[in-house]
Amino acid sequence: EIAAPGKQITVPAYGMTQINNVGRVLEDASSITGREAYLIVESEQEIRAWASQIDNLTEDPSMERSQSDADGSQRVLVPSSAAIGQFLTSLIVINQSDFAGQVTIRSRSNAGVLQAELLNQSIEANGFLHFADFYGGLGLSNLYGPIEVEALGGIQITATARIYTQEGSSGYFQGVDISKGSKKVVMPFSVDNDDFRTNL
């Protein structure tokens, strides 16, 4: 059983359940709610969850993988962001703690040079910060690189960036705990053919 506010959905053993327009389902709404939030999915059994953010104009989907409570940390690295050409970056930072705190957000170039910084941004208990156009909101453009988010005051955080275009295409980059790097990693798939290429 998966519990949501006022909702309980049964997922078959080894199966999958898709909930279309989940925001409307949770609020018993028949039309657009205008709500922005993060979702918590809780279950009696171990689960994996993902969401597809679908552009209502182009029907273009972007996949977003869930993060567990254990993914929270005090320093998070979002591997990529961009404000160059047609690409923009939205950023969301979630406070997983039941008390308020602050975060400092830093963007660095590929050479490690600081190119943007937001100091001591307040974030409520179990709340979130959302920047629809992170760099545009700072008056910056023509840059790209990783984003670091540092939690202050003992809170645990997660962060995700979405690189997107006004035409509707987009992709998610989920933050990782900076302290959990590895000396060897595996990329599950790489392709180089007439239809696709792989950048690393």
For the regions a language model picked out, list residue spans one by one:
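Gly/Pro-rich, tryptophan- and cysteine-flecked surface segments typical
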Residues: 1-200
